[in-house]
């Protein structure tokens, strides 16, 4: 009935209206008609009368127009007892009067009105693309939802519908569009409609609740969008309309594209985003990790003679890479070979099902690591090369005589290390605050397997893996290279604690089958008999033909009619149902063909016209009655990935319950058998040819008689039962699937019974077996309510579907459970998964923000413990405009970053009802707004943790945390796992430096996190604080030609390369300083002159310790202001001041300028100051100088007047690191000889003040406990105890900067920047960034601007890992590196061993080797900073350094190096920089070229070759020795 009503929408109650009665019409007098309001605008002559009330008779389906349901319905009411005859006018009045409590329907609200189309160029707002004259649309108000529809009369075009919200034209627009009344913004929407101006369109008002989209898919490209920003973007899209191709802009920084909109199972071009709309984010710049299983099946041959692995390199990868190229993605890929070698020498066929091989070793070979797909040719070349080598690397054993006999063997795929492989990949996401880079979103894992999706696994490891994946925002796809099997896949077999064989289907593993055969209609055998194939039995030869004997049929029949009668009797006779004992549960693979019939179906010859997939009849539920179409997961029809079209890439689980194809499945089995085993059927039919005509007629009758579904239970069973045509009648059983939760063992849900016929002989088979249990025929009458009940009680930890018999077809309700609950929002309603499978590989989606997944009430009450804490906003945060609303948003934001999802389950209302004392019902919200944040409750859920967040009216936010019990005991059952790993540049396998099975994401200390968000944190130097971190270094690069000379104050200045780079650093620091975070009062007032006073970076050359010893009094603490704020207001002078007075103030005033002896490149400059300090001093002390430019002009005037001059008299007065000296006529105090630094101001008060400040700094930091040793070295601790008695010098500066000065964001966008306060131009300049809730795109824009600024001054900004290089393999096993041992040990070689050199610098030769190849120092070893020659502690603003080795960066930024204690070198590529700049639009034109990654690899390999080449290395060491003989200066220790 419902489907017919859809065809006659004008008969709905809301569309019926009372028509005016024409007394002279053919209807007769006293008649009234009800007619549709959906006719054309203003057209009354063609109205169709579908309902007539005449002479007390109601007639539906009049003589005009199309009759509803093809018939006329009448109801005679003349027999009703009424007081008087119903008057027609009274009837009309009564029908027009609204019923109490029901609003009267406005007849114009569903009427279409015609408008003429016009266009405008200036956008009114970001979400408004259509403007309309509201006065021309009756009943419309601003904010209502409307539909714009186009009608195309040409045969090649289709009608288009665009939804928009009513936005009125302004006065000027109405004047210009007086005749049109509707205007569309020029751009994508105009292109989408493809209509010229003044085209007619029709507009109709629509209901928001009835017309909201089901799913909107947004695509992200070339930027990192975290899940917190995804939530914010989803919130901004609420109550808006979107269309395909629309560019969505967030905070004027993030730009996303609407790629797909789904509604009611169809892909539409426009939709309304309502409360129930799911917004999904997919990435076009993701990190893809390919894990290729290397098993013995990789060397098997296919039917066409192709090796299995050749399918990977010749069809699968080229197809995927081509698809990426066509879409324009910027993925970076990592390819890993995963192999398990069996050293037992026994056949796996002797191992029982579900049991793993014991004597095995796992190997992981990193083929490529984070390489951009732009280098696809090099990727494929490396892939082919590595595959040819891996068999020799793993199976050849080295003997003493140098031989390499072949031993061992690869494990078969069924016994492979599938769970260990998945755990190996999850190590990359163990830390939720370790961002790979700022250019990529989403990490996706794709496993390529030569098998069929069946694996034997360890039970304990399976539980640990399921638990781990529930806490990570990662999706895993499995691509199988074999043909789809006849059982449920993916399928895990294991032995449980009772010693029984169990089968489980994981919900977190999505499987597909790759088929590169374009002839999809071609038949192929479904059973794999590899040994027979290799003997050539299955090959067709011209010279000879192998004949197989006919199969003996147990049915002794002489005609097709008797054959079918006997078949039906065996299937439908209840007396033939025999129980099957446990001993007789096996059958021969060749004879057990029922699964073949139920799985393999011929592909439909016609194209599917709608996006709703119509499945084959064998994918229907076997028990449940036919229902409305719904997308389920088919468990017995594995999909194939075909290289011909996107629709051919299917999932094992893609089917619908369709009202079509309801004929008997027993008959369908005969049809399928005819098409699958065509040869065998012909032989059977040839014997029974006399009765062929009766067979055809019987076939036609049966097919015709099953068009309509039947309600009788036994008839339903008769329709859906199917048995092999070769059944003997003695082994007919009914299989019973059982579903239960793995971790909720106390819960036993009722069995769900489905029918499935199986047949076979008493023969046994030694391969895969599935338990079969017999049930009575009456069990088939069970309803699907049991299944629904189980689904409702599905627990939080249920990520496996347990199966007693995986060969049985599932019902639709149970099949949907194979879609993981956390990822269900990714799939549109009523759309088969096969239509989204290619997008999973090309543009993977991020974990959805919301979920309906929640533990059952019984599970929640009994298995969770309760914790709570409260947090309120620090009053100090109010000066930045922060409120409780902002704190609540940040708390939800940070939890989304940690992998939580916002829960919207209906069970939450019951949870609230049982545990709340509130009188009014609380709102369970998913969107935060200022209207509801005081009354809404937010439930956030992750694997084993549930958070309930509620804001009270007093401003206190209460957090209730529910933690699952006994979560830490699962890991105790897992043995230590140490696989062998070989990275890209290594020559041999080595033990992995981490245990992939035990690396998991730990829960955060949420009380501490919330307190930090509220503004309660003690020190920026707390090393235990959480947050995101990025580290950058600035390296020298080529200087643009037009930068060497410039004009300052009318004077042409020519700068050296070093001076230009120092000027670039000063400009960068100036940019950072001016971006500092300001309070609201500071923003409201005019910028003071102290904003022009820039912090000083102390540049030096030579030894760091000598400089610190000489200038430690001039180093200011990181938290101190650049200058005293009050001094800027105590201006004493103006530009008319006398030079003599200025000279005195410069040397003897209250705040004199620092005049010191400075050493620069072995040249001493006595009694000088820096130009930057002079500019700061002028701004502080002159009332009529407000900017740095004015100070430079006045300083040039003082230099011209002779007050001071440049030390080399090469420059005029410049703002920067330029040395100047007061002219001799104005100097009256000489510097004391022999002192490294003698302040010209001998004021004891000033000196005491500086010393006192340093002492206070030391006491503060030592008392805070933040500066602690981590490595436990006793010598280091002793050195620290000595240094603690002295002062602490902080050699970097921290500043909080504002990432959003324009105020586009809805939240406070801030981060902390740490930069070096002491810098040697020969080394790297460091910038570190720390943030927590800032938008990554704003940070990326900030870094990009810094890179462009550096580029103009001959500098290169390079991102490097935050952690020390040697520690990276401990948390990222895929990161490649090289260990190089020098061919000459300079410490023992008599030719280079020199005690004098090693006394100054132990690693003199090593450092010279690195510097000669373009390396610059990045970090010193921490032990060097605890030098006995200095009596103070050296720390950074971000914490105390803990580097074990000295680290160097190559001047290209492409790779790094470390010097080990034994003199070996540790090299590794800088993947962060290579992947970031491979995109091609990062730091201006400094991005790497097309072959830069390959070039950097060549440079690194060449450097390693030099290290291992005796002659070349000896030449380099001789250069180092000559350099020492020439200088003989004290060397800086690294």
Curated annotation (Swiss-Prot):
State the Gene Ontology BP annotations. cellular response to nitrogen starvation; cellular response to oxidative stress; intracellular signal transduction; negative regulation of small GTPase mediated signal transduction; negative regulation of TORC1 signaling; positive regulation of autophagy; regulation of autophagosome assembly
Protein encoded by which gene = IML1
Query: What InterPro entries has UniProt attached to this entry?
Result: DEP_dom, DEPDC5_CTD, IML1, IML1_N, WH-like_DNA-bd_sf, WH_DNA-bd_sf
Its lineage opens with: Eukaryota, Fungi, Dikarya, Ascomycota, Saccharomycotina
Q: Write out the biased-composition intervals (Low complexity).
A: 32-45, 651-662
**Stretches assigned to the DEP domain:** 1149-1224
One Pfam family, short name: IML1
Residues of the region (Disordered) are: 19-48, 580-601, 637-662
* This protein's GO CC annotations: GATOR1 complex; vacuolar membrane
Q: How does it sit in the membrane?
A: Peripheral membrane protein
Query: Family per UniProt?
Result: Belongs to the IML1 family.
Q: Which domain of life is it from?
A: Eukaryota
Q: Which PANTHER family match?
A: DEP DOMAIN CONTAINING PROTEIN 5 (PTHR13179), GATOR COMPLEX PROTEIN DEPDC5 (PTHR13179:SF8)
Q: Which UniProt keywords apply?
A: Membrane, Vacuole
**CDD domains in UniProt:** DEP_DEPDC5-like
What name has this protein been given in UniProt? Vacuolar membrane-associated protein IML1
Q: Where is the signal peptide?
A: none
One annotated GO molecular function is: GTPase activator activity
Please state the protein's primary subcellular location. Answer: membrane
Localisation per UniProt entry: Vacuole membrane
């Amino acid at each position: 009935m419902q489907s017919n009503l859809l065809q006659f929408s004008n008969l709905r109650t809301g569309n019926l209206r009372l028509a005016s009665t024409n007394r002279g019409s053919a209807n007769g007098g006293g008649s009234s008609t009800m007619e549709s309001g959906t006719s054309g605008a203003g057209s009354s002559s063609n109205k169709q009368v579908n309902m007539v009330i005449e002479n007390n008779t109601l007639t539906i389906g009049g003589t005009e127009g199309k009759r509803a349901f093809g018939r006329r319905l009448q109801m005679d009411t003349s027999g009703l007892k009424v007081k008087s005859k119903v008057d027609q006018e009274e009837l009309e009045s009564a029908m027009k009067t609204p019923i109490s409590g029901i609003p009267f329907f406005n007849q114009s609200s569903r009427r279409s009105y015609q408008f003429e189309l016009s266009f405008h160029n200036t956008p009114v707002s970001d979400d408004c693309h259509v403007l309309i004259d509201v006065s021309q649309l009756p009943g419309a108000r601003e904010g209502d939802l409307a539909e714009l529809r186009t009608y195309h009369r040409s045969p090649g075009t289709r009608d288009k519908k665009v939804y928009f919200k009513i936005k009125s034209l302004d006065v000027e627009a109405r004047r210009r569009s007086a005749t049109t009344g509707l205007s569309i913004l020029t751009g994508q929407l105009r292109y989408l409609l493809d209509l010229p101006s003044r085209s007619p369109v029709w507009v109709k008002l629509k209901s928001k609740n009835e017309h909201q989209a089901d799913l909107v898919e947004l695509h992200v490209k070339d930027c990192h969008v975290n899940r917190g920003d995804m939530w914010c973007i989803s919130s901004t899209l609420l109550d808006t309309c979107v269309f395909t191709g629309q560019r969505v802009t967030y905070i004027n920084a993030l730009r996303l594209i609407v790629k797909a909109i789904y509604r009611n199972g169809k892909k539409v071009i426009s939709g309304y985003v309502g409360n129930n709309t799911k917004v999904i984010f997919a990435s076009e710049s993701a990190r893809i990790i390919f894990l290729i299983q290397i098993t013995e099946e990789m060397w098997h041959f296919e039917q066409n003679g192709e090796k299995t692995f050749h399918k990977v390199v010749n069809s699968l990868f080229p197809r995927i890479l081509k698809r990426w190229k066509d879409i324009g993605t910027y993925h970076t890929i990592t390819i890993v070979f995963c192999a398990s070698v069996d050293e037992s020498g026994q056949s796996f066929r002797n191992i029982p099902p579900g049991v793993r091989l014991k004597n095995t070793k796992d190997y992981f070979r990193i083929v490529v690591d984070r390489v951009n797909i732009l280098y696809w040719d090099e990727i494929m070349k490396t892939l082919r090369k590595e595959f040819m080598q891996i068999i020799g690397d793993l199976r050849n054993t080295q003997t003493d005589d140098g031989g390499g006999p072949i031993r061992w063997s690869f494990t078969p795929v069924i016994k492979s290390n599938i769970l260990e492989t998945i755990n190996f990949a999850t190590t990359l996401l163990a830390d939720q605050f370790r961002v790979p880079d700022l250019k990529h979103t989403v990490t996706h894992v794709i496993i390529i397997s030569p098998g069929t999706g069946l694996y034997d696994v360890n039970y304990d490891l399976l539980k640990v893996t399921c638990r781990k994946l529930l806490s990570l925002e990662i999706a895993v796809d499995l691509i199988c290279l074999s043909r789809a099997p006849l059982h449920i896949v993916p399928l895990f077999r294991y032995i449980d604690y009772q010693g029984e064989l169990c089968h489980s289907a994981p919900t977190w593993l999505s499987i597909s089958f790759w088929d590169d055969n374009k002839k999809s209609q071609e038949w192929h055998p479904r059973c794999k008999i590899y040994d027979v194939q290799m003997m050539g039995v299955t090959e067709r030869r011209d010279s000879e033909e192998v004949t197989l004997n006919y199969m003996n049929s147990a049915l002794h029949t002489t005609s097709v009619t008797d054959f079918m009668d006997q078949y039906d009797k065996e299937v439908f006779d209840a007396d033939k149902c025999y129980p099957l004992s446990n001993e007789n549960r096996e059958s021969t693979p060749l004879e057990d063909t029922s699964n073949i019939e139920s799985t393999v179906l011929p592909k439909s010859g016609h194209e599917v016209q709608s996006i709703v997939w119509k499945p084959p009849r064998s994918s229907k539920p076997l028990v449940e009655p036919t229902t409305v179409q719904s997308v389920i997961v088919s468990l017995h029809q594995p999909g194939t990935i075909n290289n011909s079209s996107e629709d051919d890439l299917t999932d094992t689980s893609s089917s619908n319950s369709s009202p079509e194809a309801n004929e008997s499945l027993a008959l369908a089995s005969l049809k399928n058998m005819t098409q699958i085993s065509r040869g065998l059927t012909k032989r059977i039919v040839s014997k029974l040819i006399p009765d062929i005509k009766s067979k055809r007629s019987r076939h036609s009758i049966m097919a015709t008689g099953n068009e309509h579904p039947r309600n009788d239970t036994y008839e339903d069973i008769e329709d859906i039962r199917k048995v092999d045509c070769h059944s003997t009648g003695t082994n007919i059983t009914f299989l019973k699937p059982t579903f239960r939760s793995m971790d909720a063992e106390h819960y036993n849900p009722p069995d769900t019974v489905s029918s499935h016929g199986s047949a076979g002989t008493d023969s046994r088979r030694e391969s895969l077996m599935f338990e079969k249990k017999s049930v009575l025929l009456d069990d088939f009458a069970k309803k699907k309510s049991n299944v629904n009940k189980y689904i409702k009680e599905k627990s939080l930890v249920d990520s496996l579907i347990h199966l007693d018999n995986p060969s049985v077809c599932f019902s639709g309700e149970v099949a949907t459970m194979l879609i993981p609950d956390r990822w269900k929002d990714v799939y549109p309603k009523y759309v088969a998964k096969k239509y989204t499978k290619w997008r999973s590989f090309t543009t993977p989606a991020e974990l959805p923000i919301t979920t309906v997944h929640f533990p059952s009430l019984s599970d929640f009450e009994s298995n969770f413990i309760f914790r709570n804490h409260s947090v309120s906003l620090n009053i100090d945060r109010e000066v930045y405009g922060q409120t409780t609303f902002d704190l609540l948003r940040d708390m939800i934001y940070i939890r989304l970053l940690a992998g939580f999802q916002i829960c919207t389950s209906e069970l939450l209302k019951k949870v609230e009802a049982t545990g709340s004392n509130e009188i009014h019902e609380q709102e369970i919200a998913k969107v935060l707004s200022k209207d509801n944040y005081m009354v809404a409750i937010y439930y956030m859920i992750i694997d084993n943790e549930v958070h309930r967040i509620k804001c009270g009216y007093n401003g206190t936010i209460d957090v209730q945390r529910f933690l699952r019990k006994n979560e830490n005991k699962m890991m105790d059952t897992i043995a230590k796992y140490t696989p062998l790993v070989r990275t890209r540049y290594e020559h041999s396998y080595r033990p992995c430096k981490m245990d992939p099975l035990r690396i998991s994401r730990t829960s955060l200390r949420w009380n501490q996190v919330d307190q930090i968000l509220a503004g309660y944190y003690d020190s920026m130097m707390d090393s235990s604080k959480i947050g995101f971190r990025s580290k950058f270094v600035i390296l020298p690069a080529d200087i643009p030609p037009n930068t060497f000379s410039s004009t300052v104050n009318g004077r042409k200045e020519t700068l050296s390369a070093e001076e230009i780079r120092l000027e670039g650093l000063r400009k960068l620091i100036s940019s950072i300083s001016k971006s500092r975070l300001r309070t609201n009062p500071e923003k409201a007032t005019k910028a003071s002159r102290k904003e022009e006073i820039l912090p000083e970076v102390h540049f030096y050359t030579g030894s760091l310790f000598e400089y610190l010893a000489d200038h430690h009094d001039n180093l200011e603490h990181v938290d101190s202001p650049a200058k005293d704020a009050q001094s800027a207001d105590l201006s004493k002078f103006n530009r008319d001041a006398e030079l003599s007075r200025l000279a005195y103030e410069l040397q003897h005033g209250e705040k004199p300028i620092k005049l010191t002896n400075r050493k620069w490149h072995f040249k001493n400059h006595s009694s000088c100051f820096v130009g930057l300090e002079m500019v700061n001093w002028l701004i502080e002390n002159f009332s009529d100088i407000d900017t740095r430019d004015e100070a430079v002009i006045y300083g040039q005037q003082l230099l011209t007047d002779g007050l001071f001059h440049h030390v080399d008299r090469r420059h005029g007065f410049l703002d920067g690191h330029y040395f100047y000296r007061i002219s001799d006529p104005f100097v009256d105090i000489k510097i004391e000889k022999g002192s490294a630094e003698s302040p010209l101001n001998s004021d004891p008060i000033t000196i005491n003040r500086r010393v006192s400040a340093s002492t206070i700094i030391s006491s503060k930091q030592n008392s805070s406990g933040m500066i602690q040793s981590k490595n436990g070295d006793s010598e280091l601790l002793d050195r620290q105890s000595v240094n603690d008695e002295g002062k602490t010098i902080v050699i970097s500066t921290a500043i909080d900067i504002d990432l959003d000065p324009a105020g586009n964001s809805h939240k406070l966008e801030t981060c902390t920047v740490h930069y070096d306060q002491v810098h040697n131009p020969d080394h790297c300049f460091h910038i570190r960034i720390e943030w927590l809730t800032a938008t990554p795109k704003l940070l990326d824009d900030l870094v990009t601007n810094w890179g462009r600024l550096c580029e103009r001054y001959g500098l290169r900004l390079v991102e490097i890992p935050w952690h020390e290089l040697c520690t990276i393999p401990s948390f990222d096993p895929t990161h490649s590196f090289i260990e190089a041992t020098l061919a000459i040990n300079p410490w023992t070689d008599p030719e280079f061993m020199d005690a004098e050199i090693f006394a100054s610098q132990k690693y003199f030769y090593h450092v010279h080797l690195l510097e000669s190849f373009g390396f610059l120092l990045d970090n010193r070893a921490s032990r060097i900073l605890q030098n006995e020659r200095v009596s103070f502690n050296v720390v950074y603003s971000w914490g105390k350094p803990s580097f074990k080795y000295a680290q160097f960066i190559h001047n290209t930024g492409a790779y790094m190096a470390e010097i080990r204690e034994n003199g070996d070198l540790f090299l590794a590529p800088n993947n962060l920089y290579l992947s970031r700049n491979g995109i091609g639009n990062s730091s201006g034109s400094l991005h790497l070229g097309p072959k830069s990654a390959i070039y950097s690899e060549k440079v690194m390999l060449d450097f390693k070759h030099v290290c291992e080449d005796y002659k070349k290395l000896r030449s380099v060491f001789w250069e180092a020795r000559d350099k020492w003989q020439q200088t003989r200066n004290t060397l800086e220790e690294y």
